[in-house]
C-alpha cells in the first residue's frame, strides 16, 4: 500500500551561489560547473551532497537519474531488462562526475548523513527528498546555514516522483 508520494528536489545554498555570481543550476552539467566554481573559490571542498550509500540509496539515485535521462527499464513489450544502453552509461557517468565533488566517504552517506552535511554547512548543492526539506531548515542547523533560511531556495527542476 502506497503511504507517501515523494520527490527529489535540487536544494542549494543561494547565499553561496550569489556570493560567487552563479545562477541556480537547471541541469546536472550546470550543477557540476557550479560545484567546480565553489571548490575553486575555496568556500567548500566538497560542495555536492548525495545519498549514495551502497545499497538501495545508490540504486534509487541511479533509477531516478536514469529515468531523467530518458531510460526505459525493459525492452518494449517484453520483460527483458534494457539498462545496458547509452542512457545507463550517461547516468553512471554523471553520477561519477558528481561524486568527485562529494565527501570522500560518499558511499556511506544515506539521506540522514547527507542531511547532516547540509545542516553542518558543508554542502551547497544536493538532490534531497521533499519529505526531508523541513528538517533541513530546523533548529539544529549550523548558524552559518540558519542565517540563510530566508534566502535559500529549493528548486523542483530535477524533480522525479518515486512511490
Listing of model-derived features with the role each one plays in the protein:
Residues 1-3, 8, 32-80, 87, ...:
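Extracytoplasmic/periplasmic solute-binding protein
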Residues 1-17, 46, 151-152, 157-162:
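A structural signal for short loop-to-beta-strand junctions that line the ligand-binding cleft
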Residues 14-26, 100-103:
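Aromatic-glycine-rich donor-binding/catalytic loop that engages nucleotide-sugar donors
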Residues 16-17, 36-41, 112-126:
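Short helices/loops that flank or line small-molecule/ion binding pockets
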Residues 26-33, 105-120:
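Short helix-initiation/N-cap motifs at beta->coil->alpha
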Residues 34-37, 77-108, 149:
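Glycine-centered hinge/linker elements that transmit conformational signals in sensory
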Residues 52, 69-90, 138-147, 152, ...:
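Short, solvent-exposed loop/beta-turn-alpha elements that line the ligand-binding surface or hinge
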Residues 111, 128-133, 154:
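Beta->alpha turn/N-cap motifs
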Amino acid at each position: 500500500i502506497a503511504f507517501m508520494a515523494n520527490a527529489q528536489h535540487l536544494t542549494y545554498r543561494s547565499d553561496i551561489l550569489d556570493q560567487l555570481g552563479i545562477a541556480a543550476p537547471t541541469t546536472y552539467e550546470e550543477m557540476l560547473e557550479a560545484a567546480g566554481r565553489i571548490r575553486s573559490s575555496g568556500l567548500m571542498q566538497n560542495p555536492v551532497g548525495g545519498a549514495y550509500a551502497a545499497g538501495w540509496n545508490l540504486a534509487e539515485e541511479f533509477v531516478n537519474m536514469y529515468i531523467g535521462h530518458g531510460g526505459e527499464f525493459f525492452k518494449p513489450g517484453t520483460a527483458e531488462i534494457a539498462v545496458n544502453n547509452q542512457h545507463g552509461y550517461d547516468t553512471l557517468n554523471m553520477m561519477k562526475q558528481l561524486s568527485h565533488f562529494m565527501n570522500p566517504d560518499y558511499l556511506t552517506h544515506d539521506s540522514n548523513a547527507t542531511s547532516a552535511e547540509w545542516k553542518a554547512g558543508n554542502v551547497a548543492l544536493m538532490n534531497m527528498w521533499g519529505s526531508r526539506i523541513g528538517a533541513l531548515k530546523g533548529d539544529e542547523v549550523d548558524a552559518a546555514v540558519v542565517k540563510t533560511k530566508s534566502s535559500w531556495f529549493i528548486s523542483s527542476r530535477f524533480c522525479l516522483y518515486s512511490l
